[in-house]
Regions:
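Conserved serine/cysteine hydrolase catalytic core
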Residues: 185-245, 251
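Conserved acidic catalytic loop of the alpha/beta-hydrolase fold
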Residues: 81-98
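Conserved hydrolase catalytic core segment
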Residues: 96-136
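Conserved HGGG/HGGXW glycine-rich cap/lid loop of the alpha/beta-hydrolase fold
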Residues: 17-68
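Helix-rich cap/lid subdomain of alpha/beta-hydrolase
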Residues: 132-194
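Glycine-rich "HGGG/HGxG" loop immediately N-terminal to the catalytic nucleophile
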Residues: 43, 63-79, 135
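Alpha/beta-hydrolase fold catalytic core
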Residues: 1-32, 54-56, 95-96, 248, ...
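Catalytic histidine-centered segment of alpha/beta-hydrolase-like enzymes
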Residues: 258-267, 271
């Protein structure tokens, strides 16, 4: 998707960390905050941000350890840490009654935030994740992270390596994803921009236990959209259905020709479903 719309790079300091975010303008319009997934970043949402920024004040956050935000000095990448960051982000920007949309890890963080601070949200969108993960997908992602090289000879080498894990997204979308996921290292090679601690925790088996989100779901009082990629290996149909039965004002939509990276795999249908629900 090509566009002349360009976001402003901004930062805010929360919990001692400089957090970077993309401000897509339209101040005064309803606020929409976007949270990326485990290996994502604020630019993961670019197609969605461009499509929504005419009607919404879109803020796409680089969560701690990702993109241009600081790495957590203590290696704390727990749900409670992300939720605390989001709360501080909202306080710093004086956000209230906003739309929150999160994908994967960002979706779990969104559910936790919504279950604890329901009064702050106007609407909630959970993208391809649930309180319980399909073991096929969670093991696939953990294995990919454990096995990924720490450095590559060139950006093209990164694209070639990661394209083997890419099922649906276009080459242009994959390249954009990797452009903002990598950086040039002092030795001239290309490495990952997100915190090495996130990879090491998976290699060493020291990932903190996941928070049980099921007890929080009944607390989510705002209208909620659950989006599932038809070909996903992360959010099972059974868990998605249970979520709609547990979150009071919720609705489920499935996007065809999409796996776990729903809005990158099929941005057109994802955006159409999102706009349809919001209207």
């Amino acid at each position: 998707m090509t566009t002349q719309v360009q976001p402003k790079d901004k930062t805010v300091t929360v919990n001692g960390l400089k957090l970077h975010y993309l401000d897509w303008g339209s101040e005064g319009s309803p606020v929409m905050v976007l949270l990326h997934g485990l290996r994502g970043h604020a630019h993961s949402w670019d197609d969605v941000s461009v499509a929504m920024c005419q009607d919404y004040h879109v803020l796409a956050l680089d969560q701690r350890g990702r993109g241009d935000s600081d790495w957590a000095k203590d290696g704390d990448y727990t749900t409670s840490a992300y939720v605390s960051d989001l709360l501080g982000f909202c306080d710093a920007l004086k956000l209230d009654k906003f739309i929150l949309m999160g994908h994967s890890m960002g979706g779990r963080n969104s559910m936790s935030f919504a279950g604890r601070h329901p009064q702050q949200l106007e609407k909630l969108v959970i993208v391809d994740v649930g309180p319980t993960l399909d073991s096929r997908g969670s093991e696939r992602i953990s294995q990919e992270i454990r096995q990924v090289p720490e450095e590559f000879d060139s950006f093209e080498a990164v694209v070639e390596y990661m394209s083997k894990q890419n099922r649906f997204a276009s080459d242009a979308v994959l390249r954009r994803r990797l452009q903002y996921s990598t950086k040039e290292l002092p030795n001239g090679k290309i490495g990952w921009r997100y915190d090495v601690a996130i990879r090491e925790q998976r290699r060493q088996g020291t990932v903190p236990p996941s928070e049980d989100l099921w007890p929080l779901l009944p607390n989510i009082t705002c209208p909620t959209l659950i989006v599932r990629g038809k070909e996903t290996d992360i959010l099972s149909p059974e868990v998605a259905q249970k979520m709609t039965e547990t979150i009071p004002a919720s609705q489920l939509v499935e996007v065809e020709r999409a796996g776990h990276m729903v809005f990158e795999d099929n941005p057109g249908d994802f955006i159409a479903a999102l706009k349809g629900w919001l209207s």
